Each structure stands twice: as structure tokens, then as C-alpha cells.
Amino acid sequence: MDPEGEDTNPGTESKPFATIMKVQEVVAAGDVVYINPGIYVVPADQPPMTTTTNGLYHCVFDMSKSGEAGKPISYLANPNKSGRPIFDLSQVKPVGQRVTVFYITGSNLHFKGFDVIGTQVTITEHTQSECFRVVQGANDNLYEDLKLHDGMAIGFYLTGGNNNHILNCDAYNNYDTVSEGGSGENVDGFGCHINGQGRGTGNVFEGCRAWYNCD
């Protein structure tokens, strides 16, 4: 992937794709997606890849494809280029919906080395948005060196899944100025809310940091 790529390209190093949506059409177990540095601005009119909870959640990227044990699907900052990829969500403001940037339902996935910034809130009542939402059935994933910052959203929000490893990730400078009179509610850096038998075990947060968030 590259900010100057095109989804009509073949997705090679010299002719990369531009969007996660196109990548999701073609990836399979064992594939490595290299994300070049630069800013990936998600436009306001881009439809969500999916919605959940009767349309309440506007899920920008639906990460539903799974790898296999020993053959993960990897979404990695390109190690051969300097700088970080940055996904800018500041234009995505769906009226009456919660924003989830990466909605994780797939298993055996690896995410590493990129930022998510500018995630918005549009609902004025009690609500929340999330950079990563991990749900039941999303198992054995590695989230590594991700920086989730300068927005209005929770960094990581886990409601289910087994054996997920959140490693050396940062969430910072996140504050909701819109809902509940701008009181900054529901903007944790990291939240693990696995309630109920069978919803998930073995999830580990290691080396993660959170600062200047609000709840």
C-alpha cells in the first residue's frame, strides 16, 4: 500500500494499492501487506466496510479475513522505508453513528508499526468511538507498535476473543469534545471488557502505554 497508490494497480511493490478495502479483497493466509509511510486520509464519503448493532457502529475497515496457525495475514509498516504510515480519520463523521476504525473479527492476524489519528465522535449523548474493536471469535492476533492518538476514540476495545497479544502499543492525546457536553467520557487508552463465560481468555497487554486520555 502507498498513499499515492491506486486500487486499479496489481498491488506490487512498484504499483501498490491505495486502500485497506482493496487489500481485503485479495489477501489470504500467509500474505504480508507492506504499508508504506505517509498519510492515508480516509475521505468523508467513503462507505463503511460494514456496520454492526443495527447500524450503530460505522466500521471503517472490516478485518474479517483470517490467516491460519503459522500462516498469519500481516499488515506491517514497510521495514525498508523510513517513517510511519498514518491513517487519518478526521474527515469521517457519520451522523448518529459510533466510529470503529479497525473492526476485528478475523483470527491469526498481525498488525505492526502504524498510527491511527483523528477518530471522531458525532453523537452528543453517552457514546464512544474506537480505533480498534476486537470481538468474540477474533483469536490469536498480534497488535504491535501501534500508536492511536490525537482523536476522540478509545485506543483498543476488546469485548471478546482468545489469546490476543497487544504489544508495545501507545494511546495518547484522545479526548471527546462532542458527547455529554464535551466532558471527555469513554476515551480510555485501553479497555478489556470481556464479560461472560466463553467470551475470551488469554489476552495480554504487554509494554503498552496510555497518557492524556480521558474517562
Tell me what each language-model feature is.
Residues P3-E4, N78, S90, N174:
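Generic beta-structure capping elements
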Residues N36, P72, L76, S107-G118, ...:
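Right-handed parallel beta-helix
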Residues Q24-D31, S64-E68:
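Beta-strand repeat architectures
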Residues Y34-N36, Y157:
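A structural signal for short, well-ordered beta-strand segments and their strand-loop junctions
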Residues K15, P37, V41-T127:
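Right-handed parallel beta-helix/beta-spiral solenoid domain characteristic of secreted/periplasmic
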Residues G30-V32, P72, A153:
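A common structural microfeature
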Residues M1-K22, V26-A29, P37-D45, P79:
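Right-handed parallel beta-helix/beta-solenoid
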Residues M49-M63, S90-F102, T124-V135, D150-L158, ...:
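Extracellular beta-strand/beta-solenoid scaffold signature
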